Amino acid sequence: VNTLTHHVNTLAEHILAQDSDRYLVGIAGAPGSGKSTLATELSRRLNAQGRKTAIVPMDGFHLDNAILDARGLRPRKGAPETFDAPGFLRMIHALKSGDEVFAPTFDRTRDIAIAGAVAVPAAARVVIVEGNYLMFDEAPWSALAKLWDVSVRVDVPMPELRARLIQRWLSLNHSSAVATRRAEGNDIPNAQRVIDRALQCDFDLNGQPARNS
């Protein structure tokens, strides 16, 4: 069984044992750790088992580039202060209430957030939220910790994160030099900050692929 399948098995077993009308799963971790992949596979498994599940990415709460430019924050895009944290907190409270919620998402290719792109119906019994700062020991993000019914961290060693973050820029057709500069100038410091200020999670998972076994 590969690492991802093992993690999905573990989490799905735990979640399916809960009898709740609305169960919030917070998947935290550094950029490039594999949060989105885990969220997608876990959602697929839960839906296949008859537990209606939705995914909400924290990335939809990126502040627009025009606002970041006005505040001199564009070079730090992805750092905690470049997100609408109060808006994100309000949405998490709305999700906990069990109501239908429309959430934004982020288009990485166009580098823009898209409002109302994710519909979370009232019938969704599980909502998987994934993002860098879901279990993060800096205000106002630290207020999120008590809102998750279960918290999950995806842990990846820094050398692997570095390679993935450079590859992310390469996949957007940047040169090797630009990709490396962007990753090392911003993404990697953000990743280190996530690691340094991490709060204890209910599940701590190794996000490295299994070395062939």
Q: What is each PLM-predicted segment?
A:
Residues R44-A54:
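Post-Walker A helix-loop "phosphate-sensing" segment adjacent to the P-loop in P-loop NTPases
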Residues R110-R168:
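ATP-dependent NMP and nucleoside kinases share a basic, alpha-helical "lid"
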Residues E41:
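Active-site signature of alpha/beta-hydrolase-fold catalytic machinery across serine-
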Residues A54, L63-R110:
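Conserved nucleotide-sensing/catalytic segment adjacent to the nucleotide-binding pocket
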Residues V1-G26, A30:
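Extreme N-terminal, non-catalytic leader segments
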Residues I114-G116, W141-S142, Q167-S213:
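Small-molecule kinase domains that catalyze NTP-dependent phosphoryl transfer to phosphate-bearing small molecules
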Residues L38:
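Hydrophobic positions on the alpha1 helix immediately C-terminal to the Walker A/P-loop
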Residues K35:
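Conserved lysine of the Walker
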